[in-house]
């Protein structure tokens, strides 16, 4: 952003988000926005962090501080916060009626209930296919639409905890190169909720199962993870996320993988993505 995308049109809203409030790239982005004479808006879960001295307007998005470095609540809370922000902004701009605002907020409330049900569904899938999941070596996760974002978060969580290669792709992107490196040792997840994406995801999952039996298809209409129905297809992919978060924790615990390679400590000492005031919670 600071080097390539910091041209800020007058009608464009720019905000900087950092759950910890100590990420150096986010702090630099706030400084860049302020240097251009614009209001530097920072959104964080820790209003006492370094964000407070770099932001002109500091917003606490309400998830609180997590007790571990491999955060999980923050991403879900942030998605909900941004949805509510968008709805309120649309209402204030006259683009969403009072009734429309109430209806959309009700959808979010229904989604929150569905999220609670998705957690035990994820635990059940982990138990039923524990042998395959505990033997994961290389992981590919492909998703379309909002599910692509979930795929990226899921890959990050598996990689930073289990310390295995995990890549995220857009559903169609997976067909343009990534499929060529598949072997029976791969574990594959295909995420889709929109009806059009669902058909394509099912097709890819069936094809991938010809290479590896460790193939999973997540959707709101059947599939390997029986999540409850969501009131909006844009919200459904977030119901897939608890499975990956729970799996990352449970398998890292069971396989004793919390500690990293000894040389990772040297890397962290040489360069950091956090400011000097940050207290690391990650296990090295």
Task: List each model region and its residues.
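A residue-level detector for conformationally permissive "hinge/kink" positions
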Residues: 13, 34, 135-137, 169, ...
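Internal helix-turn-beta structural module
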Residues: 229-259
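C-terminal non-catalytic interaction/assembly regions of soluble proteins
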Residues: 220, 249-250, 270
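Glycine-rich phosphate-binding loops that contact phosphosugars or nucleotide phosphates
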Residues: 1-100, 107, 144, 179, ...
């Amino acid at each position: 952003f600071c080097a390539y995308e910091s041209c800020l049109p007058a009608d464009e809203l720019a905000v900087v988000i950092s759950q910890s409030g100590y990420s150096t790239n986010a702090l630099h982005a706030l400084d860049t926005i302020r240097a251009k004479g614009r209001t530097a808006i920072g959104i964080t879960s820790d209003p006492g962090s370094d964000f407070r001295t770099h932001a002109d307007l500091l917003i606490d998005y309400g998830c609180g501080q997590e007790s571990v470095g491999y955060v999980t609540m923050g991403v879900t809370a942030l998605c909900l916060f941004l949805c509510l922000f968008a709805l309120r902004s649309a209402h204030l701009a006259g683009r969403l009626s009072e009734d429309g605002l109430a209806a959309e907020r009700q959808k979010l409330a229904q989604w929150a209930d569905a999220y609670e049900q998705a957690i035990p569904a994820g635990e059940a899938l982990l138990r039923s296919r524990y042998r395959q999941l505990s033997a994961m070596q290389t992981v590919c996760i492909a998703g379309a639409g909002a599910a692509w974002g979930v795929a990226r978060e899921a890959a990050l969580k598996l990689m930073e905890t289990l310390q295995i290669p995990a890549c995220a792709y857009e559903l169609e992107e997976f067909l343009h190169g990534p499929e060529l490196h598949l072997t029976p040792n791969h574990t594959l997840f295909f995420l889709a909720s929109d009806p059009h994406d669902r058909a394509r995801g099912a097709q890819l999952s069936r094809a991938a199962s010809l290479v590896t039996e460790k193939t999973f298809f997540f959707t709101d209409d059947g599939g390997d993870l029986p999540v409850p129905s969501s009131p909006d297809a844009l919200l459904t992919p977030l119901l897939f996320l608890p499975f990956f978060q729970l799996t990352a924790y449970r398998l890292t615990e069971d396989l004793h993988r919390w500690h990293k390679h000894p040389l990772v400590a040297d890397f962290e000492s040489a360069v950091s993505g956090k400011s000097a005031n940050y207290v690391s919670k990650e296990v090295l």
